Amino acid sequence: MLDRDVGPTPMYPPSYMEPGIGRHTPYGNQTDYRIFELNKRLQNWTEQDCDNLWWDAFTTEFFEDDAMLTITFCLEDGPKRYTIGRTLIPRYFRSIFEGGATELFYVLKHPKESFHNNFVSLDCDQCTMVTQNGKPMFTQVCVEGRLYLEFMFDDMMRIKTWHFSIRQHREVVPRSILAMHAQDPQMLDQLSKNITRCGLSNSTLNYLRLCVILEPMQELMSRHKTYSLSPRDCLKTCLFQKWQRMVAPPAEPARQAPNKRRKRKMSGGSTMSSGGGNNNNSNSKKKSPASSFALSSQDVMVVGEPTLMGGEFGDEDERLITRLENTQFDAANGIDDEDSFNSSPTMGTNSPWNSKAPSSQQGKNDNPSSQSSQ
């Protein structure tokens, strides 16, 4: 038997699955259920018991220590934007009830939940803040706008960012109240007037205006509470520290060490070509045929490979490229050497290429003999 079968059925939001039905955790890190818990906690508000400690405990349960709450709306004199920190958030919710509200809750339609690295965002374009006002007269105020929340992605799921952008509001008066004062024109005229401005009571608006002064003074208040200094000394200390931050030289960016290029090394072929002939003959048997070609130092080139972001090449990108040309047809490569030419197989004893042309002196000696024979 489930617990819900014993007592009265508790209220759950539409997207929440009741405990015991395929779920082990109370709310499974659902952001909309956190809003449901916030509404349930606000329903426990009573004018006698809810003091500063109660509101501070409420804020600690649902808001992070560095939380920021932002309210934006538009009045007759232009758009307004108020941002308060964690210290001033409890008084904001308390000002709503001090303005005549007896009930406060938020209704979210089609919220969008997104997961990020360390937080979960909830974006609801159709959010309605509903307040039941008992004074100066019974009126229900519906404030429509967009609510954007950021919850820390941990077990507590507390709010770090609260941003409520108000678009419009409606004030609803029950028909029974109108029927009671149907014969009183003065009362009907009073009922036709709005009791809020853009859905916010005068108490809340005055507190938000006061927060414009209180929010920058949070540093002074914290220093006064921590060090027990006088307000004048706190102001002097804060101003001096701010002045130090302003006149401090900007931090120099870390300089990158210049890329050192490697020295070009001479190739082994060029060293061998500059040596004596004896060394060439003795090492010719040990060298491979590919290394027997003479290389000059001008054939060594450094090629820069393209790197990311258009940077220049460095030590890691340098390459030594040796260019090997076919020097067999080079006249300076010793192909005209007589000794190597005579050792060719084509220059054998019986080869017709072996007979040398008669010299000019021998031709002169043969001419007299030929004449005498005649």
From Swiss-Prot:
Expressed ubiquitously in the embryo and adult. The keyword Lyase does not apply. Residues 267-297 have a biased composition (Low complexity). It holds the Pfam family LIM_bind. Signal peptide: none annotated. Residues 1-24, 249-297, 322-374 are annotated as: Disordered. One of its GO terms (cellular component) is transcription regulator complex. Keywords: Nucleus. Binds to the LIM domain of a wide variety of LIM domain-containing transcription factors. PANTHER family: LIM DOMAIN-BINDING PROTEIN. This is LIM domain-binding protein 1-A.
